[in-house]
Amino acid sequence: MEVRKLTSTDGFIAFDLGDAPAVGVVRLAPKVLRDGAELLARSTTYAAASFGLQVGGGSAGLNAKPEGRDEAVAAFVAEVGELVESGRWLPGPGTGIEPDDLAGL
């Protein structure tokens, strides 16, 4: 398990299989727990494997209060763009995130 701390906002991304391509969700709340993100990344790996997909799980957590939500999401999108463009990670919306929030990716 690799956990990357974000530098532009209070958050992190948990990748279950190191450098393997990953899929998973982005969650936003006042306090997203790292342990929960790691478990979600691991379960996403197993779910993908059950469908014969050769990808790992990746789960992001953004810690932001409602008044700082938009700024946190914008910073996150700007910071992880390279991971998405390179094919390293395919994120989807989870709790607290709308599909339009990730449109810039």
What are these regions (language model features)?
Residues 1-105:
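N-terminal ligand-binding/catalytic initiation module
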